């Protein structure tokens, strides 16, 4: 493993969470996108060398809404940067 690429946080309301995190970090997200294949909307914040991804489920059936229904809002995943995903 080279480093943590980003930490993904599942949220119920991306717009509200963007406002909260922008207030905490003193900056707006540098990227927002809809990932149709997963049924989610995301925002990314750069915090020093680290990235935080906020994810909200937008489709009827999606992994983020299922996660929140079971566990509530919070850390959903940690993504690592590697040289070779099949070797690590």
Language-model segment annotations:
Residues 1-2, 9-51, 88:
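Core segments of cupin and vicinal oxygen chelate
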Residues 11-19, 59, 70-88:
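Vicinal oxygen chelate
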Residues 30-31, 61-66:
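A short, acidic/glycine-rich surface segment
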Residues 44, 68-71:
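Short, charge-rich binding segments
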Residues 49-51, 64, 71-75:
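Short, low-complexity, polar/charged sequence segments that are solvent-exposed and flexible
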């Amino acid at each position: 493993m080279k480093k943590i690429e980003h930490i993904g946080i599942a949220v119920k309301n991306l717009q509200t969470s963007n406002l909260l995190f922008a207030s905490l970090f003193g900056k707006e997200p540098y990227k927002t996108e809809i990932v149709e294949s997963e049924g989610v909307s995301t925002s990314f914040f750069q915090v020093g060398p680290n990235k935080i991804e906020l994810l909200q489920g937008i489709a009827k059936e999606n992994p983020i809404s299922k996660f929140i229904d079971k566990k509530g809002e919070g850390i959903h995943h940690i993504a690592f940067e590697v040289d070779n995903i099949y070797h690590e």
